[in-house]
Amino acid sequence: MEFPEKKEERIKLKEGNTYFFICFALVCGGKSTFFEQIISQTTSEQNKDKYNIKIVSSDKIREDLSLQMQKKNPNMTFKQCFDKVGKETAKKFDAQIRAAINQKMEDKINIILVDKNYPQGIGKFLKSFCKDISSQFFLVFIPNIKKSIDINGLKFPYSLNYFIQCYLRLKNRHGHEVLNGEDESSKAVYLSFFKLFQNFDFYKKINSDKQYENNVFLNTIDFTDESKDIEVDKDTEILFENVIKHLRAFDMENIKTNYEKDINNYFNIIDEKYDGKGFFADTRELIKNQVIDLLENGINKL
């Protein structure tokens, strides 16, 4: 994936404008930590009175709705409730975004942190919520990577570094409202999300509508440690290729029947090589400095 050459121009965040922060990320890609901890903490440390920050989390909305349904229907499991509240989650998410827009303050920099996955691009989001192109801007954050995955024509906009580190975060995650490492389907769900990004071009996805080309900005962030040269042997690469090439995203029965053994074998290799050894560095301090630079010096315009 190649980006157009960056211009030197940087556009500073202005009072009275609204900035939507959106991430193109995998499961456990650092999105929630980026929003809830790093940005919220950094803006508070810099000058909290300067910003009006709202966060809208699709996962949190779905968890709340699932718990409400389960309370009314004690014979249903959380998973059953979770599966039933998808449409209501989408409606409530849109309503909360609109409410956040309406809470705009003219004397502050308004930031809406959009905690939701957008594997199909943000075109629909722009059409739904970009009503004032003079004061609404969309900052799309993607992982800063060295080399994207390309296995015999199977192309993904993420690096093997990023893919492995996100998986390890998922494996060791507990207490999340939607997906945890101990969940039986966690590997299949992770690969399903990854599959949605096959042949995905970040730049084309965010610039597909010329109407908004001056309102959307692409920003790279060090969500993971890209300093290591990660390689897998040919047999492991073939194993991964055979799974991801034919996998039908979120068809859990098909995945379990046809690919579960190969999936487990592949991730067992990853676990043995990289889990629990302190191989990858923590990048949160680096991300914080990148956020400070953005807040103080503005957005790089592509």
Feature-to-residue mapping (PLM):
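Conserved substrate/cofactor phosphate-moiety recognition/catalytic segment
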Residues: T33-D107, Y167
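Phosphate-binding P-loop
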Residues: R10-T18, K104-M105
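N-terminal pre-Walker A segment at the start of P-loop NTPase domains
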Residues: M1-K12
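Eukaryotic short linear interaction motifs
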Residues: G30-K31, I55, R62-L65, Q120-G123, ...
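Hydrophobic anchor at the beta1->P-loop junction of P-loop NTPases
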Residues: F21-C23
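The conserved Walker
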Residues: L26-V27
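Glycine-rich phosphate-binding loop used to anchor ATP phosphates in small-molecule kinases
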Residues: D83-K147
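Conserved GTP-binding G-domain of TRAFAC-class P-loop NTPases and closely related GTPase folds
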Residues: I145-L302
